[in-house]
From Swiss-Prot:
It holds the Pfam family Ribosomal_L6. Keywords: Ribonucleoprotein, Ribosomal protein, RNA-binding, rRNA-binding. Part of the 50S ribosomal subunit. This is Large ribosomal subunit protein uL6. One of its GO terms (molecular function) is rRNA binding. Belongs to the universal ribosomal protein uL6 family. It comes from the Bacteria. InterPro entries: Ribosomal_uL6-like, Ribosomal_uL6-like_a/b-dom_sf, Ribosomal_uL6_a/b-dom, Ribosomal_uL6_bac-type, Ribosomal_uL6_CS. GO terms for cellular component: cytosolic large ribosomal subunit.
Amino acid sequence: MSRIAKAPVDVVSGVEVSISGQEVTVKGSKGTLTRVFNDAVEVAQEENQLKALPREGFADSWAQAGTVRSILNAMVQGVSQGFEKKLTLLGVGYRAQAQGSKLNLTLGFSHPVVYEMPEGITVETPSQTEIVVKGADKQVVGQVAANIRGYRPPEPYKGKGVRYADENVRRKEAKKK
């Protein structure tokens, strides 16, 4: 049985929640997020709290309720505070430059990589080797950061590549004769 599902999600001031059937819409200062949830879970609002309640007749309703509660918490946190992922570039000539909703990356290929940001996501480059991805949707922010990292993941011998700022890359020793 899920213990996470039993904890209610606190709705902070400045955040509006509207529930219609299985569709939940959360509005805040950072934007609006809408999501349709599984039929095994009922989302209920009591004053300034949201609850994910499992429905009878579904085998995995408690597990689904825990997942829904975590997603609701991320939605409330996203529209009030937002999420961000920091990436760093390590390597000779590796550079990043934000231009509006596009990110230009020079990663040692014969051509520059241009990454178009999805709607609701902003990107900043405080320096040529740092990238900050920001947005209200936790899943999309993480996916964009993973896509950017995927162009040149850190390699284990020299550590060159695109990595998360808090990532620890395991280094290997070069083969010896």
